[in-house]
């Protein structure tokens, strides 16, 4: 009699735990989606470096439109939603310093970017600058 009761309790617990496990969401996102508003024009016109705040000057290995496939994939993986896909996005960027010498320390694509808050991977709202 005790064995039957133990088996019944075990079966009940197994079913109850299975129901709780099935009710648990599988996709528990820890990184919420970030919407970024950029007011920089989507043009490729070059501006003088003096018209850009020093903290916004970046040296990027690549500068592409936000609508290009590689950039849209990276934005999607990072959970970044842009309101305007006509802006330029810099990839693998680092701040331009005067200490670097030469071209202001940039041998790639010098740009002025509005949003540099995603580390060195991506800068959003970029405009090419002449150093």
UniProtKB/Swiss-Prot annotation:
Q: Where would you find this protein in the cell?
A: Secreted; Secreted, Cell wall
GO function term, MF aspect, one: structural constituent of cell wall
Presence of keyword Glycoprotein? yes
SMART domains documented for this protein: HYDRO
Checking InterPro entries in the record gives: Hydrophobin (IPR001338)
UniProt keyword Cell inner membrane, yes or no: no
- Which cysteines does the record link by disulfide bonds? 52-112, 59-106, 60-93, 113-126
Glycosylation sites recorded in the entry for this protein: 53, 115
Using the record, list the residue span of the signal peptide; answer none if the entry has no such feature: 1-23
Q: Which UniProt keywords apply?
A: Cell wall, Disulfide bond, Glycoprotein, Secreted, Signal
Described by its record, this protein's role is as follows: Aerial growth, conidiation, and dispersal of filamentous fungi in the environment rely upon a capability of their secreting small amphipathic proteins called hydrophobins (HPBs) with low sequence identity. Class I can self-assemble into an outermost layer of rodlet bundles on aerial cell surfaces, conferring cellular hydrophobicity that supports fungal growth, development and dispersal; whereas Class II form highly ordered films at water-air interfaces through intermolecular interactions but contribute nothing to the rodlet structure.
Q: Quote the subunit structure annotation.
A: Self-assembles to form functional amyloid fibrils called rodlets. Self-assembly into fibrillar rodlets occurs spontaneously at hydrophobic:hydrophilic interfaces and the rodlets further associate laterally to form amphipathic monolayers.
Protein name as annotated: Class I hydrophobin 9
Source organism: Flammulina velutipes (Agaricus velutipes)
Which gene name does the record give? Hyd-9
């Amino acid at each position: 009699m005790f064995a039957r009761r133990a088996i019944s309790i075990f079966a009940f617990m197994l079913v109850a735990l299975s129901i709780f496990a099935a009710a648990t969401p599988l996709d528990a996102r820890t990184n919420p989606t970030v919407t970024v508003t950029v007011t920089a024009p989507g043009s490729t016109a070059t501006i003088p470096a003096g018209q850009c705040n020093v903290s916004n000057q970046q040296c990027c290995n690549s500068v592409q439109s936000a609508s290009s496939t590689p950039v849209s994939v990276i934005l999607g993986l990072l959970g970044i939603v842009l309101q305007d896909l006509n802006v330029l996005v810099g990839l693998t960027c680092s701040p331009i310093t005067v200490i670097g010498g030469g071209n202001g320390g940039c041998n790639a694509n010098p740009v002025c970017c509005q949003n540099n808050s995603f580390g060195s991977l991506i800068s959003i709202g970029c405009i090419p600058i002449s150093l």
